[in-house]
Amino acid sequence: GRVLDLDNEWLIITDRKGVAKVNKQTLKEEKYYLQPGMSIVGAITISSQKQVWTANARHHATDIYILDRDLNLLRTLNGSKDTYIESIVEDASHHMWVTTSKGLLCYDAKTWEELLLPTDFMEATQNKKIHFVLPYWQNFLLIGISGEGMYRYDVARRVLTRFHVQQQLKGDRYVCFIDTNNGIWLSDQENDFHYYPEKAAFNNLSSIFERLEDPFVKNLLFDYEGYLWMRSSH
């Protein structure tokens, strides 16, 4: 499941029952939100408005539930029945980006209205497998498109450009994380691991796994002290 930080007192956790609000001190569940088919949803985030945006199902999710901080349903955003939701993130301009099986959708985090995207952006991302969408330096997004590579999208200017062109993302799946120095940590979850600093061209940190028999990276996380935590297959 997922663990999200709501505020100083509360966590939002997904488990087999649905979405739970949990007290950090007592670890007691104050409230659940559950709809048929939800289970352990993967596409979920907490917006800048302290609202929970979550997919309506674990598999083949088509709709988004917007919940308040007490997990009361505020609104349902209905999607197409043949378009499946994969992830939800918010950028610095308070736009919610929804990755789907057929491309990207964008919503206003405050009004919940869908926003129109530039034609060239839609052509570049529509009907393609998108590995990740992450808030990046200042008001940018980092977008990873399968078989093509990484793109940087200027949200204010609405301009999409290729980024680190050596990387074409030809693998089946990727783990990507952006640190506080705007460095990009990228793994294909098999045997390759790359670090892209903000200003340098390219570095390969695969040697970090020399002591591991099977360097299968599942997750990357930087904690508040700046340490990198990796969850591997061992």
Segments from the language model and where they lie:
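Carboxylate-rich, polar loop motifs that coordinate divalent cations or form catalytic acidic clusters
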Residues: G1-H234
